[in-house]
Amino acid sequence: MGYAEKMGTRRAKTLVALIDGLDPEYVERSDMPNLKRMISSGAYTVGKAVLPSVTNVNNASLVTGRFPDQHGIVSNFHFDPRTGRSVMMESAEFLLRPTLFERAGRLGLRSGLVTAKDKIKTLLSRGADIAVSAEMPEPAFVSAAGSRPDMYSAEVNYWVFRAARHLLRRNDVDILYLSTTDYMMHAYAPAEAPSLEHLHRLDRLLGEIVDDHAHLGVLLTADHGMNAKTEGIDVARVLAAKGIAAEVVPIIRDKHVVHHQNLGGACYVYLEEQADTLKASEVLRGFPGIEEIHERAEAARRFRLRKNRIGDFLLLGACHVAFGALPAARQEIRVRSHGSRHEQAVPILCYGLGPDVRRLEYNLDLTRRLYHSRTVSTAKWSEGYRPSSL
């Protein structure tokens, strides 16, 4: 008899799990018997993350069930060309659409968020009845899940899963959003021993959560994949060499520099002079390693980004390329990172809920459908739902 049967669950629960950086190759190569059993008995596909393929953009998309043109989160880092000020995109004031927590509350449901990174809590927990981060845990969760873990370790993700289990077992929430951190994916390729151990232990913790609840619905996905980057490009230096002044923002940029050295596969370019637009476009299009160049209007339309929050250009790199501030315009680097189209593939799993994943193209489609499931029979998550497409 499982924990739920012993304690008397009030109603079925839903776990929305975003495993940061869980490239499908990690799933394929790892010993994860519980997840693979859920894949076999549930509904599974490999779908797409939202571009740019970074943490804030995709967590916001999953929490709101909307693309960035509606929710407003287009980067980890925001530059305002009118003021010249730069800030981390970590405040809820940037989020322009209701969260799943707010929607759940209107239906009389209790919701919670457990995350590794405190920035996810400050950005996305609006409306949650309970919100906790491993980075800055409250005393009650230290006693339940353990002392504050090292953010640059596998332990931080184990802490998140233990805290999630604690909340679900206490019957405090009907729906719980879980978000890990991708330090281990940045540090290790799928076949490396530390990665295999990390995911095997996460799988065991996931299995314990599922075993606790006879009717738990699980929606599991990732915010992006991961690739080895061997060539760095400093776009500001590339343009400056041709007499073009610009502010270049690596979209991956955040305070967790150890993860990725602020080097990622996508960047925004803000020109100092709009008269340089054509010249800059020609320079960038001729530079090896820059795979895609989209001017603001095209980028907003094609990738459903909020036009007034992106640069004059959106650049996407080749698979081996990362953009960022470097000592030279081009140099050899060694970092595992993401942000480009090459890190867009993500796993999409529905377990215990029953939707047809063939209709789910993007990770955010999981929460666009959430209250169409039987988990909360009185709820409708999205009226007139249609699968998203680009």
Task: Annotate the PLM regions.
Residues 61, 65-190, 259, 265, ...:
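His/Asp/Glu-rich, glycine-adjacent segments
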Residues 11-24, 38, 62, 104, ...:
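Beta-strand elements within well-structured catalytic alpha/beta cores of enzymes
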